Amino acid sequence: MHRLKSKFSHLALLLCIAPPAIGAAPRSITELAPLATISLGKTADWVAITADAVWVASTGPFAVHRIDPKTNTRIASVDLPGEACAGLAIGSDSLWVPLCTTPTSLAKVNLTTNRLEAIFAVGPAAAEGGIAFGAGGVWLIINESADLARINPANGAILRTIRLPPGSYNPTFSGNTVWVTHAKGADVTAVDAATGRIIAMTATGLNPRFLTAGAGAIWTLNQGDGTLTRVDARTKRARTISLGTPGHGGDIAFSEGRVWTTMPEVPLSLIDSRTDRLLCQWAGPGGDSLGIGHEAIWLTDYHAGTVERIAVADALAHCSRRGHFH
């Protein structure tokens, strides 16, 4: 890490910290009545959404499940040789599933046939990592040295590796750039997908892990201090706001000008990307991973092994009423 800091001493780590911007006291998650609750296994985690499906992983069984958003029913389950432990990604007509097998591995699920197509001998560096797809490749941190690998989706071959700060685990792809949070630090690294060159390191809140892209920015959910950092994708300038949600786990997604986050005990938070303002929070049981699509929030309850479908319109309507937790 010291070597990387020296190499990029000419790059400013720009961070503007804003005070909490909470529009209302936390509400109860029970006010959001699910349109459907789908039981998947002992635990449910990780959500990926396509134009015609919602995919969610489980343990007990080790599997990924395809849900039809038209009927809110599970229409396929694909058994896996181990736990899906580091996110899900969509690309090249496939669902990509990092597995905490021994040794770790990468599953490729065919989105057309709903079948396990391949298991590649490359896998995630750690649980709670992530995976991304972009520029025709799969992107994954593959070891504790934090080598970011670009993987050939056809055969699982590693095409290139880029050394990042140790403790970096979670990538996302946006605008021909791979962004990777430094979960054991307080920064995010931008990598040019075409050249493999590190082009920026930007300060964030403490222990950023899960991240998403939208509104010309990268958004990091920071586990160490319960904050959210917005990094301008062009200027690399950052602004951090308080969410009051520190802790392990969690997830983040962007849709239609809004950022949604989830953490255990605070299953849902809503942030306006235009103002960087925390509009509403819902507290209570459940939460841990989410996806936004098909006019719905797909929210897992990890320990219950379920995923709920909550209408975005319902959440927005309740938020506009500015009620309080009860």
Model regions and ranges:
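Bacterial N-terminal signal peptides that target proteins for export
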Residues: H2-A12
